[in-house]
Amino acid sequence: MLRVAVPNKGALSEPATEILAEAGYRRRTDPKDLTVVDPVNRVEFFFLRPKDIAIYVGSGDLDFGITGRDLVHDSDASVCERLALGFGSSSFRYAGPAGRDWTTSDLAGKRIATAYSNLVRKDLVAKGIEATVIRLDGAVEISVQLGVADVIADVVGSGRTLSLHDLVAFGEPLCDSEAVLIERGDRGSLDHHETVAARDQLVARVQGVVFGQQYLMLDYDCPRSVLDKATLITSGLESPTIAPLAEPGWVAIRALVPRRDINGIMDELAAIGAKAILASDIRFCRF
């Protein structure tokens, strides 16, 4: 049976649970449950702290896990990133008191508070900077105000929390993060045929859900005279579906397009004379 770790709390927990449910896996009925067995799909889910998931997967105790890329990098665990899941986006950055033009060279000799000490130490070594790293388990933003640290290194989303504590982010991100599906680096426990089949099924299903969230189905009519231009705009995955219309000189086109680009694509199609442009949500897509 495949063993998969899922965040038990935090910003990644609910979206991770939802994406697995959309992929056809059993939900837990009680938020206090730490394990859920899905016998139909041959998977057992373990609900763990997000910070611990990469360690469990890397040690070989679990086969897969969903956690943040920043947590994976900080763990130094022997895991492989299998899929980016498209939620939980953030960046990991240094931040210091507002009112000063900070650069990363200013970190030399400073006290840096963070919950991601391994990630910060690796970055400092790469930059050739000597500084003191102070490990805290949370609420690192207050450490500067309390005099525990000079600067911090933390996950930054909207930046609102930094502003509340009069801090400003600086330098390039140490890591651009989002939720990822990770797999143990050593696949020794996956030699059994049924386990391999469950693994491949999990990856394909989750990938299908993620793809469905990132793409839309676009249908439209256009003059045959601009067909070449239209298919350049909407090339689809392999190629668009094209069918003749009853109206002479017109065709109907269907293609998958990236959700993030939909408005610009519709503008381009309208500009070349396309009509009845319809974008529809899709739930799953295998490719």
UniProtKB/Swiss-Prot annotation:
EC number: 2.4.2.17
Subcellular location field: Cytoplasm
GO (cellular component) term, any one: cytoplasm
Primary localization class, coarse: cytoplasm
Keywords, in A-Z order: Amino-acid biosynthesis, ATP-binding, Cytoplasm, Glycosyltransferase, Histidine biosynthesis, Magnesium, Metal-binding, Nucleotide-binding, Transferase
Pathway the protein takes part in: Amino-acid biosynthesis; L-histidine biosynthesis; L-histidine from 5-phospho-alpha-D-ribose 1-diphosphate: step 1/9
Catalytic activity line of the entry: 1-(5-phospho-beta-D-ribosyl)-ATP + diphosphate = 5-phospho-alpha-D-ribose 1-diphosphate + ATP
Regulation: Feedback inhibited by histidine.
GO biological process assignments: L-histidine biosynthetic process
Cofactors named for this entry: Mg(2+)
Key word Amino-acid biosynthesis present: yes
GO molecular function, one term: ATP binding
Transmembrane segments: none
Family assignment from sequence similarity: Belongs to the ATP phosphoribosyltransferase family. Long subfamily.
Protein's job: Catalyzes the condensation of ATP and 5-phosphoribose 1-diphosphate to form N'-(5'-phosphoribosyl)-ATP (PR-ATP). Has a crucial role in the pathway because the rate of histidine biosynthesis seems to be controlled primarily by regulation of HisG enzymatic activity.
Quaternary structure and partners: Equilibrium between an active dimeric form, an inactive hexameric form and higher aggregates. Interconversion between the various forms is largely reversible and is influenced by the natural substrates and inhibitors of the enzyme.
Protein name: ATP phosphoribosyltransferase
